[in-house]
Amino acid sequence: LGDKLTAFAPHTTGIPFYKRERDCSMEIIKQMYDIACLYDLTEHLNPTDETYDRLVVQELGYRNLTDTDKEDVLQDTFNAAMNISTKGLLDKDEFQLYLSGITRIRGFIHSESYSLESAIRDASKVAYITASLMTQNKELKHYSSDIAPEFQDASIEQPFNTKLNKLKKTNFEAFYYWFETYRLLQNH
């Protein structure tokens, strides 16, 4: 999980949008999908956090990013997840690349009919893991439909991105993870 997280940071340690003019958006989405699948099997961030810390330092060194640190990489991952979940609110051009990757990866995912809504769900899990790493939260929570009623009145407030509240009506699982992310970062 730690290595996948370093790969889903397109502006720092991760797969870039382009390698020698080749569109790598599908590979970026593949990393996000893999992170979400691994997350579903993970209860604790130990030893993921240690692996992540070690690999971030290595990847930053390989790329000679001397002015970049772990927090910058986590923010890069978080911003990518936010941009997907808000359908381009942070960067519309990058969102178009993510959409291209989502469309192109459909033929490789056989467990479900992968869509933008699936990607938003996966991005919300990535955001939650990222926030957990930012706040040293080790215990991971997982969505189940039986806990949905207790979140019906939940609301994400400013200065966090309140557009995420729209997910409550369209993708409740994604809203759940964004709300848990909000709760973690609210006190950070």
Tell what function each PLM region has:
Residues L1-S111, E117-H188:
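Catalytic cores of NTP-dependent nucleotidyl/adenyl transfer enzymes across multiple folds
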